[in-house]
C-alpha cells in the first residue's frame, strides 16, 4: 500500500494542543522548498486543519502540490476526525473521538 502521512497545516500552537496521531506540522504559510526539503516526495500527504471555517488545509494542499508533492485534503479537518471517533494526541488529546453520527 501507499505510505500516507497526515500533515497539520495549522500554526504550531494548534498542533501542540491537539493533532492526529503521528501527524507532522508545517503551517501552510511556512511551506517552502527549504521547510519541506526533508520530506519524502514519494509519500502521499493528507493536509488538515481545524475543519469547517478554516482553510489552512486547502492552502497547505495547494502549496504542497506546487512544491511537487502528492497531496489530498482531509475534508472536515480534525473536528470531523474526532466526530468519526478517532483519537488525537497533544495537550488536549483524547483516546477516542466524539463518535458523532450524521446522516451522510
Put a short name on every predicted segment.
Residues 12:
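Histidine/lysine/aspartate-rich catalytic loop segments that bind and position anionic ligands
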Amino acid at each position: 500500500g501507499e505510505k500516507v502521512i497526515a500533515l497539520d497545516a495549522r500554526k504550531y500552537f494548534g498542533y501542540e494542543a491537539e493533532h492526529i496521531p503521528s501527524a507532522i506540522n508545517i503551517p501552510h504559510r511556512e511551506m517552502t522548498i527549504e521547510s519541506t526539503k526533508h520530506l519524502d516526495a514519494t509519500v502521499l500527504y493528507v493536509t488538515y486543519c481545524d475543519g469547517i471555517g478554516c482553510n489552512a488545509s486547502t492552502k497547505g494542499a495547494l502549496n504542497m502540490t506546487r512544491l511537487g508533492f502528492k497531496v489530498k485534503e482531509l475534508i472536515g479537518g480534525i473536528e470531523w476526525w474526532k466526530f468519526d471517533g478517532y483519537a488525537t494526541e497533544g495537550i488536549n488529546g483524547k483516546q477516542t473521538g466524539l463518535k458523532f453520527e450524521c446522516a451522510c
